[in-house]
Amino acid sequence: VLSPADKNNVKACWEKIGGHGAAYGAEALERMFLSFPTTKTYFPHFDLSHGSAQVQGHGKKVADALANAAAHVDDLPSALSALSDLHAHKLRVDPVNFKLLSHCLLVTLAAHHPAEFTPAVHASLDKFLASVSTVLTSKYR
C-alpha cells in the first residue's frame, strides 16, 4: 500500500519527468529488450532497433499510462481498467514482464535523475510500479 509520502514521491517524480516521459519509456523498453530478450516475442511486428519509431511510439504509450496512473494513484483499478483488459484478454502478456519493465524503468529514471533518485524515492517508485503491475494482472483468470 502506498503511503501519503509514497504518493507525494511518485507525483513529484512524474512532474520532474515532464516532457521526457516518452523518451524514458522508449529507453526502458530498449533496456528490457536487450536485458530480457524473451520479451521481444510480444512485439514480432515491431522494428526493435535502437530509436525505431515503433519503440518510441510504444514508449510514449507506457509513459502516458504511467502518468495517468500517477495522476490517479488513489484509484489505480479505475485508471488502468482498460489497459488491464487489453493485456489480460487480447495481448495475453505474461505477468512477469511487468516486473521486468518496471525494473528497467527504475534503472532509466535513476540514470537520468541520480540526485533525485534517493532511497525513499526509489522505494516509493518501486511500490508504485508494483501496484500498477498488480492492477494490470488483476484480470488474468
From Swiss-Prot:
Residues annotated for heme b binding in this entry: H87
Domain of life according to the entry: Eukaryota
N6-acetyllysine carried by residues: K16
Signal sequence coordinates: none
Stretches assigned to the Globin domain: 1-141
Function per UniProt: Involved in oxygen transport from the lung to the various peripheral tissues.
Name of the protein described by the UniProt record: Hemoglobin subunit alpha
